[in-house]
A protein has these predicted regions:
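Histidine-centered beta-alpha loop that forms part of the nucleotide-sugar donor binding/catalytic region
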Residues: 8, 131-133, 161
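Short, hinge-like loop/turn segments at secondary-structure boundaries
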Residues: 50-52, 116-119, 144-145
Length: 161
């Protein structure tokens, strides 16, 4: 069984990791991917102004890619503590860390990021915590968890309170 466990810095996320670790620690053939979505990339790194000169355009494109890669590296370094803490929690619960993979996403749409990672990693199960949602969000279906429940066809979804 391949499980994608979406984590963030919240206390609720910490409880979800504890729950999964204690529930699955003795389950044979289980692989867990800890997945954390970085904050959105700044707008100025999404595209450059362009140029009518093909050589200048190519140079601008290379420069933009380099700046994007540098931003992603910096964000991963500053956010790696989220995955490190989740690993520590799994270890404390007795989970075999040789079956754990760590990965990041970095798009604006967190739910879409989670689904893309679940599909590309061939996960069968997605585990998320339910964050407190306002009455308005509940009525109109807002929030990452609600979006996953609506859009995640072909996956088992565990929502841990």
């Amino acid at each position: 069984m391949r499980v994608l466990l979406a984590v963030d810095e919240s206390e609720n996320s910490h409880r979800v990791v504890q729950y999964v670790g204690s529930l699955l620690r003795r389950t044979p053939d289980v692989a867990v991917t800890l997945f954390h979505v970085l904050k959105p990339m700044p707008r100025e790194l999404l595209e450059h102004g362009g140029s009518e000169n093909p050589a200048a355009e190519a140079e601008l494109s290379v420069q933009l890619r380099n700046e994007q890669e540098a931003w992603i590296r910096k964000e991963r370094e500053s956010e790696c503590h989220v995955l490190r803490e989740a690993c520590e929690t799994l270890t404390q619960s007795g989970f075999d860390m040789s079956h754990v993979t760590l990965t990041f996403g970095h798009e604006d749409d967190i739910a879409r990021n989670i689904l893309e990672e679940a599909r590309s990693g061939h996960h069968e199960t997605i585990v998320v915590g339910r964050h407190g949602t306002s009455r308005i969000k509940r009525i109109f279906g807002g929030g990452v968890t609600d979006q996953l429940l609506r859009d995640a066809k072909g996956f088992a979804i565990w929502v841990v309170e």
